[in-house]
Amino acid sequence: MSAVDYSLQIDEARETAICEVRGLSKSYRNFWLNDVSFKLEPGYIMGFVGRNGAGKSTTIKSMLRLVKPDCGEVKMFGMNYAENEEECKKHLGIVLGEFDYYADKKLKTVTGVVRRFYPEWDEAAYRRCISRFELDETKRVKELSAGMKVKYALALALSHNARLLILDEPTSGLDPVSRDELLDIFREFVADGKRSILFSTHITSDLDKCADYIMYIKDGCILMNGDREEIIGGYRLVCGGKADMTPELEAALIGVKETAFGFTGLIAERDLNAADGLQTAPADIESIMLYTEKYELHQEA
């Protein structure tokens, strides 16, 4: 009879959310991450969007306990992350900013160190990534461009059978061709329906291309969280002349950009009756962010 392994194991039959966050908060002197909650199911990509300083990195670092949150609970693979951090990390692929570890070491040396930490290291997968990303293992880390450092970090993350990738601004610094290639890899990664990705970005076109869900953070608070198509479908851009700006319409607009001839504003689909007779157009994530942030009409006092 074979020995029974009593170590903590992932029960895929019982697991529903691959990642679940409840009430995550973290306060600093001039910033407060306030009650962040969300759930990510297997097989999906969640894009985490917000302007610089909105709280994306603080959320991710608090989730991973790189900074200690004030309160909140994080579950990954059905396990409490704080209580089972080592076990959870075996199934995580993490890329946080530019890869600057072991700057004077060659890539093959760094890889030799990293692979020892992962029992499920997949050398064949690593070789495929190295080839696909056109990485030269004889180069030193400090010799790589910012984009190539991101590719190398992703090659490591994709090579140990991770079930969840958590990526902070992974496409920043990549040229358009490399960025599009990376988004293709994201879609391939979740195609089996068992793996998921949470990635933060300020490049809204990335979300249009590959995100199933959008989580939008502003000033430390989650403003929107849901299916990408449903979020986009919930808003319209409305255009009109100066005489068309009625008190009812002004009250309904989320944000407005005035021009010499009139205005363009963002309005919720449910409030479209206030824009009756005016020209409207579909919104996208970029316009929703722009009119919510830059052209915000109803700002808090």
Model-based region annotation:
Residues V21-L24, F31-E41, G72:
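Conserved beta-strand
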Residues G50-G55:
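Walker A (P-loop) phosphate-binding loop of ABC-type ATPase nucleotide-binding domains
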Residues L64:
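Helix-to-loop junction immediately C-terminal to a conserved catalytic motif
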Residues E86, K90, L96-Y152:
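ABC-family P-loop ATPase nucleotide-binding domains
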Residues L165-E169:
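Catalytic Walker B motif of ABC-type/P-loop ATPase nucleotide-binding domains
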Residues T171-S172, T204:
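Short loop immediately C-terminal to the Walker-B catalytic DE motif
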